[in-house]
Amino acid sequence: MSDINATRLPIWGIGCNPSVGDEVTALLASGEA
């Protein structure tokens, strides 16, 4: 469970920046595709 929290917390922190959030969303979308 700790590893899941460690990966999710940084994502929420990055989400504070719209531009960076969009890049992360694009990376996640391309990775899942």
Swiss-Prot record:
Using the UniProt entry, state the residues involved in the cross-link 2'-cysteinyl-6'-hydroxytryptophan sulfoxide (Trp-Cys), renumbered to this chain.
Answer: 12-16
User: At the top level of its lineage, which domain of life is listed?
Assistant: Eukaryota
Q: Write one Gene Ontology MF term.
A: toxin activity
| Modification (3R,4R)-4,5-dihydroxyisoleucine occurs at | 11
Residue numbers carrying (3R,4S)-4-hydroxyisoleucine: 11
Matching InterPro entries? Amanitin/phalloidin
Protein keywords: Hydroxylation, Thioether bond, Toxin
Instruction: Mark the residues carrying the PTM 4-hydroxyproline.
Output: 18
Propeptide positions: the record gives 1-10, 19-33
Q: Where is this cross-link: Cyclopeptide (Ile-Pro)?
A: 11-18
Q: Where is the signal peptide?
A: none
- Record PTM text: Processed by the macrocyclase-peptidase enzyme POPB to yield a toxic cyclic decapeptide. POPB first removes 10 residues from the N-terminus. Conformational trapping of the remaining peptide forces the enzyme to release this intermediate rather than proceed to macrocyclization. The enzyme rebinds the remaining peptide in a different conformation and catalyzes macrocyclization of the N-terminal 8 residues.
Classification via Pfam families: Amanitin (PF24112)
Q: Which family does it belong to?
A: Belongs to the MSDIN fungal toxin family.
Q: What else is known?
A: The typical symptoms of amatoxin poisoning are gastro-intestinal distress beginning 6-12 hours after ingestion, a remission phase lasting 12-24 hours, and progressive loss of liver function culminating in death within 3-5 days. One of the few effective treatments is liver transplantation.
> What does this protein's UniProt record list under function?
Major toxin belonging to the bicyclic octapeptides amatoxins that acts by binding non-competitively to RNA polymerase II and greatly slowing the elongation of transcripts from target promoters.
Name listed for the protein in its UniProt record: Alpha-amanitin proprotein
Record the organism: Amanita rimosa
Protein encoded by which gene: AMA
